[in-house]
A protein has these predicted regions:
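Interhelical loop and helix-boundary elements at the membrane-water interface
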Residues: 2-7, 22-64, 76-189, 194, ...
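N-terminal signal-anchor transmembrane alpha helix
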Residues: 68-72
Length: 251
């Protein structure tokens, strides 16, 4: 477990410095927060996996729970009473504070994290019962890559919009079909990446169900609150694939 704690410390330092640098880019270079926020999104998802190649540890229900708690505490450093006193945290916060999200930025971010990690822990626990924990990476790839690309692609290339709501607000927001397509194609990509961990029937079922289901989850989820829905739907459909495939095996 020593490697796990070292990894978490490195992740905290790197993400904080990255957020600070991107925050300065927002404040002084006029870079859109839509882009800097997603850079942090990618780093949050893929930095730990990169670090694990040097600091391997056995991931499971417990490590995910601890990691989620630590991340929530990291977010707490950016609440207004703290960031107003420390320029480091105030600048870092600028990298994730989209103007259209104000004044709900911290509320939406913190509640999303609090909802996502219990769902992730539950899905990992259930997959452990099948000895198929590795398949959680289908959902992780879609949530990390697909959802990460959806917003910048939508901002840059989105021409076909649809409306979505947000929690605790009557304001309407928009997503794009071009952005949602990123979620769909990342679902196909994720299933193909993990094909070595699935039987032929599981792969066929996964390709038929998971990309569509997760695209719909992202499309209908509240603004900024897509992660809990992606993990819930992605994890549930992955387990569904395992169960349905087992019926074919029995038959």
């Amino acid at each position: 477990m020593t490697n796990f704690w070292i990894l978490e410390l490195i992740k905290f330092v790197v993400l904080l410095l990255l957020a600070y640098g991107l925050g300065r880019a927002v404040q002084h270079a006029g870079i859109k927060v839509n882009y800097t926020r997603k850079i942090i999104h990618f780093a949050l998802f893929f930095l730990p996996e990169y670090l694990k190649t040097f600091l391997p540890y056995k991931a499971g229900f417990g490590t995910i729970l601890v990691s989620g708690t630590l991340f929530l505490l990291t977010i707490a450093l950016m609440v207004k009473p703290i960031r107003s006193r420390f320029s480091l945290f105030n600048t870092a916060f600028a990298s994730i504070d989209r103007p259209e999200d104000r004044p709900h930025t911290m509320l939406w971010l913190s509640t999303q994290v609090m909802a996502t990690f219990p769902i992730l822990c539950l899905i990992v626990y259930l997959l452990e019962q099948y000895d198929r924990t590795i398949l959680i990476f289908i959902t992780v790839i879609v949530a990390g890559l697909g959802d990460g690309l959806a917003e910048p692609v939508g901002v840059r290339f989105g021409r076909h919009k649809y409306a979505t709501r947000a929690l605790f607000s009557d304001r309407k927001y928009t997503r794009s079909y071009e952005g949602s397509a990123c979620v769909f194609f990342s679902g196909i990509f994720a299933c193909l990446i993990l094909k070595g961990e699935m039987s032929t029937i599981e792969l066929i079922l996964a390709l038929s169900i998971i990309p569509v289901a997760m695209t719909l989850a992202e499309a209908f989820s509240p603004h900024t609150w897509d992660s809990p829905f992606l993990y819930l739907v992605g994890g549930t459909t992955t387990i569904m694939v395992i169960e349905i495939a087992s019926l074919f095996a029995i038959g």
